[in-house]
Amino acid sequence: MKTNRPNMLALLLQDFFACHLPSLRGMSPNTIQSYRDSLVLLLRFLASHKKRPASSLDLGDLGAQEVQSFLVYLEQERNNSGSTRNIRLSAIHSFFRFVAAQHPDRLEHAQRILGIPFKKTCSRVIDYLEYDEIQKILSIIDRSTPKGRRDYTLLATMFNTGARVQEIVDLRARDLQLTKPFQLHLMGKGRKQRCCPIWPQTVQLLRRLCLELQIDLGSEVRIFQNCRTTPLTRFGVRYILKKCLEQAQVHIPSLQCKRLHPHSMRHSTAIALLKSGVDLSTISQWLGHSNLNTTNRYATIDLDMKRKAIESVKPVRDQRARTTPWRHDHTILEWLEAL
């Protein structure tokens, strides 16, 4: 008689998502959701490929060949970029590292999948907002309405802190330090906390917003809320920024050539700090980067800074270059042979 007992794959997936990722790895809900989406796509692909319901799939159905076929499917049929393909593969790798630890007898199986390499991708040019562009965008916002005041405070805080979108929407009243030294307490990736200094102007904006919403400082209430007084989501922030950019494009044509999104505000903060002479190590701590190499990319972005650096250095004058060497020889071949 058939039983409905879960197979090994089902049990491993349950332990991976219910215990390993949130408790042992301490991953954020967004990362867990990304991993879940990746494995759901994989299981659906396998179910379609093997013409079987996903509930009947077991660990033996998920080999290196199947994973490679899945990665090809992502790029060729779903038109995913190499970066998205690598994100999906990262989730699969994480799951099979867990499989290897839980079942050493499956180590060879796991190693074959862990041996599938990430694809080398072309890094895109990072689009960011210049300081003048940000000032213009903020000036267009109608601050005579509660929604306008919220949007202004939201974008100003994002530019001041360079915080990730999730860090902004997670910001609670207790995370605000609106007495000197002014700063925000942010919860970053990997649940790493950091303090970020804020300008007096940002302090005033946050104070007014809390007063208007009747939020008690020190409480657990989220600072940025929608019209239903529920916390803004990442998608809500994206919508607000998109709306503000569309309004600003009429006055700032240069915005039409840029691919901008909420993370662009973070890039804009980094470039503004770099232009102000702040060193990369400080910028790395400001943004909450765990690796300085992540911050180093900003040093290669701003072409104006490169031009100014070149202009500030006088080229070395080569006195010998004033005469062409081979003119003293009978032929150019003789000169080349003498090298």
Residue ranges and their predicted role:
Residues 1-339:
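Conserved catalytic core of the tyrosine transesterase superfamily
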